[in-house]
Amino acid sequence: MPNQPGPLSDPIHIEQLEISTHIGVPDEERLRLQRLTLGITFWPYHGARDLEDRIENTINYSAVAEAATNFVRDQSVNLIETLADGLATHLLGSFAIQKIEIELRKFALPDAKYASITVTRTASVN
C-alpha cells in the first residue's frame, strides 16, 4: 500500500495523553515538571475499509502515543507553540500520516482550567 496523497482517510484520535516535562518561560516554572495533555488526531494514508483488519496495514496508535511521549519528554523549550509544532513535524516524519492535528494543553494558570495551542500540519508531497 503506497503512501500517495489522496482524499483524507478516516481519522484516528488519541484523547488527553498525559505527559510531564520541563517547559515554561520563567526559570521557576521550568524548575518543576509541568503537566501537559495532548489530543492527537491523525489521518493515515489508508482508510478503515482498506485495512483488511490487519494492524500492519494501519498506524498503531500505541506507537504514536509512545513516540509523542518520548519526544515531549526529551525537549527543552519555553513555549507550548514550539513544542506542538515540533511534535507535529516529528510525528509526520515518523509515521505514514498525511495530516495531523495536535491540541497541547498546559495547566499553569491559577484562574483558568488550562492554556492550549492547536496546530494542524499536512505532510509535504515529494
Give the residues covered by each predicted segment.
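N-terminal, polar/charged subdomain of small-to-medium soluble alpha/beta proteins
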Residues: 1-126
